[in-house]
Amino acid sequence: MSLSRSVAAMHFPVTAPPPVPVPHAPHTGGLHEATATASSSAGPTSTSIAAGPRVRSSCETCAASKLKCSKERPRCARCVKRGLDCTYVLLKRAGRKPGQPQTSSRSRRREPSSGGPSPPSGVTGTSTSSDMLQDLFGTPLDMTVDGFDAAMSDSSTFHSSDLLDDHSLSAFTADPFFIHGLDDQQLHSICDDDPHSMLGVPPLMNHALMEPRTPRALSISDNGSQHLRTGRLDGVSCSCLARVLSLFQRYSASSESLCMHQRKPELDERLENVSTQSILSQNGTAVELLSGILESPCCQDGYLVVMVALVTFKILGWYSAVAQRTKTLLPGERHNPSPSFDEQHSNTTTTIRGFCLDGEDSERRTVQLILGELHPVRQLIERFALRLKLLVEEMQDADKAGVAAKDLCANAMLSTSTLVYKQLETDLRSEWRALSARVIDRLKNL
């Protein structure tokens, strides 16, 4: 038996595979240096065995059959007895390859993949994200701070002073919208198709609402978003939205000045520059303008309807302020105006809607005039409620037809908008009733 083994060993010599060269690592740590020193001092045989690939102790046939192998080379006893092919394969170790330096998992994650282009040295993450956005949208995007500042800069750059200056009391008292009345010719010029003639629309609003947008901004949005924006774009095209926004800006600036007057009673003399005649005249003009907008075809836009409601709240607030501005005289008191007031207004007669506001009972006539002016506001609220009813019905019909079902957000916006519209109508009616009750009580006390 030993003779056959020696003969087999002579015909089939077992040669170890050539050693794999170990690459020199720049920095491997103390453990790798100690291992390399021990390998070099152990001799040539131990170095070749440790460095070379290892062979499995059992053959492939026995390992596949889950049987114990005799581990004889080149063929085990079981394979010789059954006439099977006996093959010893290399041992596959899990983990890193032998001779490769250790690298942290964090450094491996930062390495770029072989399939994608690696960014050149010196390129920051901003430029890399810019390239990704360029591949996504097909147009070069400038993500630097300078490019953002250049994109935001325009001839109509927004400044806080553009709106804060209007809130000052001096601008309020010098505003021609609340000092001088508008005649019929100016009223028709407001209602024309030119949005720039609407009570002096500010340049910022002209730029934001009147200039057409580029098609690239609309190409990014989907069909559902474009459908939801259709009514708003139609409202802008006929300038009704610009007119309502201009009215809202004027009333907001004036309301801020009124709040300043209520906090500082010493500003009462400056507030008197704004006469009751001018306030009532401009409120009537605004009510006529809003009534015409509600009758226009572009009022199918929900944004426009909401802005009409907000301006109506402002009008009711100014009627309430005018009704409460003059103090109620106690029994036995007599209203004696100052001499300066008599000198300034001795030759002036204030007449609105056939009511003469001068004389001893001027306060009562003013309150009666305000009570009469509330009737056009009530008609405006009725038109507003009718427009809301038609708008909600159109939205519900569009939802049933499947037009708004293309976008998942459309159904949520439908229910939300319906609730908002109903709440606006309820609040307008409640505010009008409360103001009418206060005016009637004030009239009884005079």
From Swiss-Prot:
Coiled coil: none annotated. GO terms for biological process: aflatoxin biosynthetic process. Gene3D superfamilies: Zn(2)-C6 fungal-type DNA-binding domain. Keywords: DNA-binding, Metal-binding, Nucleus, Transcription, Transcription regulation, Zinc. It comes from the Eukaryota. One of its GO terms (molecular function) is DNA binding. The keyword Transcription regulation applies. InterPro entries: AflR (IPR013700), OAF3 (IPR050675), Zn2-C6_fun-type_DNA-bd_sf (IPR036864), Zn2Cys6_DnaBD (IPR001138). Residues 15-24 have a biased composition (Pro residues). It is found in: Nucleus. Induction: Expression is positively regulated by the transcriptional regulator wor1. Expression is down-regulated during biotrophic growth within tomato leaves. The keyword Heme does not apply. SUPFAM superfamilies: Zn2/Cys6 DNA-binding domain. Residues 34-51, 113-130 have a biased composition (Low complexity). Residues 59-86 bind DNA. GO terms for cellular component: nucleus. Transcription factor involved in regulation of the gene cluster that mediates the biosynthesis of cladofulvin, a conidial pigment not required for virulence but that plays a role in fitness and resistance to environmental stresses including UV light and low-temperature stress. This is Cladofulvin biosynthesis regulatory protein claE. It comes from Passalora fulva. The gene is claE.
